[in-house]
């Protein structure tokens, strides 16, 4: 896995967490 892939996964997880918090 490349650093870019790791960052993209972290961003996806972060967006999901934010969505759950605001819902």
From Swiss-Prot:
Cofactor binding description: Binds 2 Mg(2+) ions per subunit.
Domain of life: Bacteria
Self-association state and partner proteins as the record states: Oligomer of 12 subunits arranged in the form of two hexagons.
Main location: cytoplasm
Record GO terms (molecular function): ATP binding; glutamine synthetase activity
Modulation of this protein's activity: The activity of this enzyme could be controlled by adenylation under conditions of abundant glutamine.
Protein name, as recorded: Glutamine synthetase
EC number: 6.3.1.2
Family that this chain belongs to: Belongs to the glutamine synthetase family.
Principal EC category: ligase
Keywords: ATP-binding, Cytoplasm, Ligase, Nucleotide-binding
Function: Involved in nitrogen metabolism via ammonium assimilation. Catalyzes the ATP-dependent biosynthesis of glutamine from glutamate and ammonia.
Gene Ontology CC annotations of this record: cytoplasm
Cofactors: Mg(2+)
Catalysed reactions, semicolon-separated: L-glutamate + NH4(+) + ATP = L-glutamine + ADP + phosphate + H(+)
Location of this chain's protein in the cell: Cytoplasm
Top-level taxonomy: Bacteria, Bacillati, Cyanobacteriota, Cyanophyceae, Oscillatoriophycideae
Residues annotated as signal peptide: none
């Amino acid at each position: 896995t490349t650093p870019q892939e790791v960052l993209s996964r972290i961003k996806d997880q972060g967006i999901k967490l934010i969505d759950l918090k605001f819902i």
